[in-house]
Amino acid sequence: MRALWVLGLCCVLLTFGSARADDEVDVDGTVEEDLGKSREGSRTDDEVVQREEEAIQLDGLNASQIRELREKSEKFAFQAEVNRMMKLIINSLYKNKEIFLRELISNASDALDKIRLISLTDEQALSGNEELTVKIKCDKEKNLLHVTDTGVGMTREELVKNLGTIAKSGTSEFLNKMTEAQEDGQSTSELIGQFGVGFYSAFLVADKVIVTSKHNNDTQHIWESDSNEFSVIADPRGNTLGRGTTITLVLKEEASDYLELDTIKNLVKKYSQFINFPIYVWSSKTETVEEPAEEEEAAKEEKEEADDEAAVEEEEEEKKPKTKKVEKTVWDWELMNDIKPIWQRPSKEVEEDEYKAFYKSFSKESDDPMAYIHFTAEGEVTFKSILFVPTSAPRGLFDEYGSKKSDYIKLYVRRVFITDDFHDMMPKYLNFVKGVVDSDDLPLNVSRETLQQHKLLKVIRKKLVRKTLDMIKKIADEKYNDTFWKEFGTNIKLGVIEDHSNRTRLAKLLRFQSSHHPTDITSLDQYVERMKEKQDKIYFMAGASRKEAESSPFVERLLKKGYEVIYLTEPVDEYCIQALPEFDGKRFQNVAKEGVKFDESEKTKESREATEKEFEPLLNWMKDKALKDKIEKAVVSQRLTESPCALVASQYGWSGNMERIMKAQAYQTGKDISTNYYASQKKTFEINPRHPLIRDMLRRIKEDEDDKTVMDLAVVLFETATLRSGYLLPDTKAYGDRIERMLRLSLNIDPDAKVEEEPEEEPEDTTEDTEQDEEEEMDAGTDEEEQEQEPEKKSTAEKDEL
């Protein structure tokens, strides 16, 4: 009986289990679940696609609802231009995939701008959702990235029109309506945008894009596309957004990095940290919180307290619940753009400390800026900007000068970072200037290459240069001379050479050493103020160092007469001055070239002419005989006082300093026609008629023009003048031989006397040493043989004894 009862109970349980299993299959079972993962390969391609689509779920919709939704949605084909645009974007236009997030946030900002402007005239515009924010959420499990804004949203018609056709962003049409409605004609350039183009960049990282949008004048709709076609349908969940748009990206496998919180945060800070509206990212952090203690721990603590505090137990009216501290991972919205763009505020409202803090944050520098300027430019293009001059020159400032792009100027369009990858935002010589430019008139173009050619960018560049030069000009003289010029003086000189339109402004910023002060530098304005009466030229002398320049024979008479001479000691200096035709109406005169003349009285003029006539025989002898192939002409000098002679370049020839620089160029091959032309030009040989060497030469050639000693002396004087004038000798050995010959004559040594020959050393007798070595080797060999024979002798002796 008992066995029957147990058997019946088992049957009932089996029946119940079978019925329950049937119920579960009927409710939630699918073919895929029944087959299991082990039969994945038996599915058809259509089944796999269907299952992948069902895995893409929106909040509040399960797989079957999503499938039903797709079946009922209205299908559309993209406009032909849209297909071409998407292919262009995906294949080539966007070189950097990460900008998709910048574009989506920019679109969200435009939508928020719209609703905020509408709310100024419509109090009910924000009733659906008073928040004006952008929120970004990553869903690693479902491979989804959500970007949600509470902007104006889109109606069904706008979803089809704006996302299915190109150049129909909705924003431009919106601006037209607002312009017509405004009576005062106030500009609404804040709202300019190109939603239709930037939106398609989402397909750079997404296989599928789902847009859920709610407009105040329509119900909530869902737009979905895989880049081939799109569909639109009313959202069966109803109004879940209140107002605004959520863009959901089903990321490609290779784009999974964009589901990492650190990646998203860095992109937001890089491109969108100055957007006008708060941007939040759904992120986690670890917090220490208090939780109720477990019952056993609480009971134990209560017992201990009861033993220790039995005396006061009656006085406690209520007992607090026992808790403990634990670490938990808490998820919340984290604000990413807490730094507000100070360039959008009036400069009068920004404190100096704020500029310094912004500069350090923006440039990643630890030092304060040397100078800054905050301005708003208006006219053909309107933009706001803050520019900074760093305290010290960036490392490698002139490495690859001209070919390396400057990335110190960051371009924003409506607070959206566009790029810092520019070659032409600032001229090359201002490549040390750092700053931001924010324009509302530039388009949010999809290509920085296209933007680079935009005509408004050239206008911006022109204004940036002018403002930068104004900023530099306002740096205090002491700070300018001691700090700025040491760090960036070469840049200003290069600017004089390269920037024709701003050459006059840049010339006022130049600083040079001069004979006026042994250490201080001077400006050209200060030089002109100190010029002597009737002085019509600015005199300068170029050399490898100040010592070389101020000891040059070319400056002797100028310094003696009290004229100030500018010393050019940097390789770029002479190029810089050559690029300046004049300064303040005064032309520049290189004192190492022809053209140096002094104001002279009639008496002085007569004396000079008499001297020239006196030395005419020597001058002709030098030109036609002694130095026939070496000089263009020989003249009596007006610039020499101590030196016997000097070699002077023509007005369009190379000075000694310039020739040395040109021949030292790394790319110099000797085949350049212009270089060879300048280098081969003959020069003028100037003599000092008051020098004893010159006067004695005049006496000697009058006695004998063919005197070999005088001929040698003339050549040595020429070669010495070549060196003292800064030029290089083509044959230094011949120069050395002539100097030696002159020294022999001065010491009464026969010029043809030969150098004494060294006595030949007798070779060392190595025969005895060799024989001795051979004997030692033979003895050593004999010893070795004897040592080898000893064991044999011992063995024989032992045998004999036996």
Curated annotation (Swiss-Prot):
Residues 289-317, 757-789 have a biased composition (Acidic residues). The keyword ATP-binding applies. A motif (SRT pseudosubstrate motif) lies at residues 42-44. PROSITE patterns: ER_TARGET, HSP90. ATP binds at N107, D149, N162, F199. GO terms for cellular component: cytosol; endoplasmic reticulum lumen; endoplasmic reticulum membrane; melanosome; midbody; perinuclear region of cytoplasm; protein-containing complex; sarcoplasmic reticulum lumen. It is an enzyme of class 3 (hydrolase). InterPro entries: HATPase_C_sf, Heat_shock_protein_90_CS, HSP90_C, Hsp90_fam, Hsp90_N, Ribosomal_Su5_D2-typ_SF. Glycans are attached at N62, N107, N217, N445, N481, N502. Coiled coil: none annotated. The modification Phosphoserine is found at S64, S172, S403, S447. Keywords: Acetylation, ATP-binding, Calcium, Chaperone, Disulfide bond, Endoplasmic reticulum, Glycoprotein, Hydrolase, Hydroxylation, Nucleotide-binding, Phosphoprotein, Sarcoplasmic reticulum, Signal. A motif (Prevents secretion from ER) lies at residues 799-802. The modification Phosphothreonine is found at T782. Belongs to the heat shock protein 90 family. This is Endoplasmin. The lineage of its organism: Eukaryota, Metazoa, Chordata, Craniata, Vertebrata. The gene is HSP90B1.
